[in-house]
Amino acid sequence: MQTPPELKYAPSHEWLAPDGTVGISDFAQDQLGDVVYVELPEVGRVVTAGETVAVVESVKTASDIYAPASGTIVAVNEQLSGSPELVNQSPYTDGWLFRLDVTEESGELMDAEAYAAANG
């Protein structure tokens, strides 16, 4: 399982990059199986940490995606509408979900080492 050290991780398996980019972890995409659809939030939406903001559907199940921080959605990954498999192939780069202008991080975020220990 990959856990890039520069990211912070939520117990619900979302990651948050220093620039506000959000996605799901390698562990999460592996548990979901092949992703077939991603429902993304609207740009401009104000969200609170812990709020459901997106849905990732796989051949196995649908999973809610929660905001790992409070802030405003400033971008979404439009590539996912035609290529949802990017979430599986590249969860930390091409498979990102949305970007936040962060106002406050969740107090539950973990560093890579703690996240790996909790899910290893």
Swiss-Prot record:
Cofactor dependency: (R)-lipoate
CDD domains listed in its UniProt record: GCS_H (cd06848)
Gene Ontology CC: cytosol; glycine cleavage complex
Cofactor note: Binds 1 lipoyl cofactor covalently.
SUPFAM superfamilies per record: Single hybrid motif
Highest rank taxon of the organism: Bacteria
Keywords of the record: Lipoyl
Gene Ontology BP annotations: glycine decarboxylation via glycine cleavage system
UniProt-listed Gene3D superfamilies: 2.40.50.100
Keyword flag Transmembrane: no
Boundaries of every Lipoyl-binding domain copy: 19-101
InterPro entries: 2-oxoA_DH_lipoyl-BS, Biotin_lipoyl, GCV_H, GCV_H/Fam206, GCV_H_sub, Single_hybrid_motif
N6-lipoyllysine PTM positions: 60
Pfam families: GCV_H (PF01597)
Subunit text: The glycine cleavage system is composed of four proteins: P, T, L and H.
Family: Belongs to the GcvH family.
PANTHER family: GLYCINE CLEAVAGE SYSTEM H PROTEIN, GLYCINE CLEAVAGE SYSTEM H PROTEIN-RELATED
Reported function: The glycine cleavage system catalyzes the degradation of glycine. The H protein shuttles the methylamine group of glycine from the P protein to the T protein.
Name of the molecule in the record: Glycine cleavage system H protein
Gene source species: Deinococcus geothermalis (strain DSM 11300 / CIP 105573 / AG-3a)
Lineage: Bacteria, Thermotogati, Deinococcota, Deinococci, Deinococcales
